[in-house]
Amino acid sequence: MRSGGISVRRWGTALVASTAAFAVITPMSSAQAATGPSVGAKGAFLLDSKPNKTLWSKAADTKRQMASTTKVMTAVVVLETRGVDLNKKITVKQSYRDYVARNGASTADLKKGDKLSVRQLLYGLMLPSGCDAAFALADTFGTGTTEAARTKSFISKMNRKASDLGMANTKYDSFDGISQAGNNYTTPRDSAKLARRALGNSTFGSVVKATSTKQTATNGRVYTWYNTNKLLGSYSGAIGIKTGTGSVAGPCLVFAAKRGDRTVAGVVLNSPDRYTDAKKMLDWAFRTHTTMKLRTLPAGAEQD
């Protein structure tokens, strides 16, 4: 998707679906563990979620564009709205579809007039990276008399939430990652803080760990969405979280994996090989070696 010279990419390549294969997990030597992971990402961060302990980082506080990983905050603002009703129905407007078409954006392909619940739209937001779903949620949870006012209000809520969470080097100018002026940025450390917060919400966790979902609108239309995060179903214990790709941001990934009672969350920003980077970081955190065959997506599925 492109706007104001900053793009968040929508891929159209058709891929054949397959089942991911796991290799035997082997322990890592103490010497290898001491060196830390070697990753190609320009920025990265790794934390142990429960004790909130930093495990490793690279350029942790350097500000970078975040593309569609922005949508993690979109979801958090919705889910942490006081008295939020996840079953509330939202009617899809033509303006949501027009926005996607105008920006060449990733989409949940929402149809005008369909009514879906807030919970369903969270799946449409986080799995296919639907900018139309993001628009619908921002339009609903913002305040004001016009769409422009409501979405602006929602973005203000995103920035207030970032401030509340101590994300001092993060700014949002977008509800979905399409930045008009390049003022939509974060740092690996800030993004990891947000990931940890988000994973504390059970609804968020259920959404982002799903590799696919079928959701039925009130008129009976069935939406099938596939998760753009290929780490799911490919890396043992992976439980999320969100992809993002942009012309300035590059490929980004906010990710997490759980083994036993331990949850590790990580971030890579502007990575030439985000899944390999994530695998290396998680292997290092869990002190294991794995090989990984990436889950592929069906023909026509959104890729971000």
Regions found by a protein language model. Name each.
Residues 1-33:
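Secretory targeting and sorting signals
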Residues 10-11, 72, 259:
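Hydrophobic alpha-helical segments, especially transmembrane helices
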Residues 11-13, 44, 57-62, 89-93, ...:
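A generic short-segment signal for beta-strand/edge and adjacent turn/coil regions
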Residues 24-27, 31-189:
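Active-site-adjacent loops and short helices of periplasmic peptidoglycan-processing enzymes
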Residues 35-43, 51, 139-304:
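Penicillin-recognizing serine hydrolase domain
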